[in-house]
From Swiss-Prot:
Pfam families linked to this entry: Methyltransf_3
Protein's recorded name: Caffeoyl-CoA O-methyltransferase 1
Binding positions (substrate): K33, D175, N206
Residue stretches of biased makeup (Low complexity): 1-14
Annotated stretches, region: Disordered: 1-29
Residues at which a divalent metal cation binds: D175, D201, N202
Role according to the record: Methylates caffeoyl-CoA to feruloyl-CoA. Has a very low activity with caffeic acid and esculetin. Involved in scopoletin biosynthesis in roots.
Entry keyword set: Acetylation, Lignin biosynthesis, Metal-binding, Methyltransferase, S-adenosyl-L-methionine, Transferase
Catalytic activity: (E)-caffeoyl-CoA + S-adenosyl-L-methionine = (E)-feruloyl-CoA + S-adenosyl-L-homocysteine + H(+)
Binding site for S-adenosyl-L-methionine: T75, E97, G99, V100, S105, D123, A152, D177
Gene name of the record: CCOAOMT1
Coiled coil regions, renumbered to chain: none
Tissue: Expressed in stems and roots. Detected in leaves, siliques, flower buds, flowers. Expressed in the tapetum, but not in the endothecium. Detected in the vascular system of leaves and all flower organs, including stigma, stamens, petals and sepals.
Amino acid sequence: MATTTTEATKTSSTNGEDQKQSQNLRHQEVGHKSLLQSDDLYQYILETSVYPREPESMKELREVTAKHPWNIMTTSADEGQFLNMLIKLVNAKNTMEIGVYTGYSLLATALALPEDGKILAMDVNRENYELGLPIIEKAGVAHKIDFREGPALPVLDEIVADEKNHGTYDFIFVDADKDNYINYHKRLIDLVKIGGVIGYDNTLWNGSVVAPPDAPMRKYVRYYRDFVLELNKALAADPRIEICMLPVGDGITICRRIS
């Protein structure tokens, strides 16, 4: 049956409203910890495979961290589980973590390491680390951690300066100041062994990497967005590594050094 002018106008108007609504949805403030579009699906993942297997110490630290005003900085529970398994899969023993916060990912790493495993952990804020330290100590893994308070770059420069340290790290996790990720990578690529892994957190950065330029964002999200985009391009073009970007937590890029 032929469509009348009025019906066509209504259809056009409806389509226009649908497009506007879709555009408005895309312009909502970005800031969800999980990048899954379905909260129910994410909750299903947590309740089915994450929380039932989460060590009691990690659960306790997660709950303590949830009360902290900057709790959004913590590693998500599903990402903690992923890191724990990844470290076991690569048989990591000598590791490094840049950016600790209260230590959730640090604890996930320490629990996965063998008894003589080591973590060089760096963060500018010892107070946050000490919030989780009693739980880490109770879990019996504090002896694996060498915590250094202060900016990571000077420490890395000192380590890189000694060629004996080159290629000695099995696994490195970075969840720190995004504006220095490129600077970290330039140093870490020499420190991780061939076949070793570097994990960069927040590489999808609240989904902002695909947000329109005029999308409402929190100031810190907008500020660091370009640095994350720069890192992602650099990693994709780096012939010394194989990469895999995963939508776990806020996005994590796994880099395996091949040369």
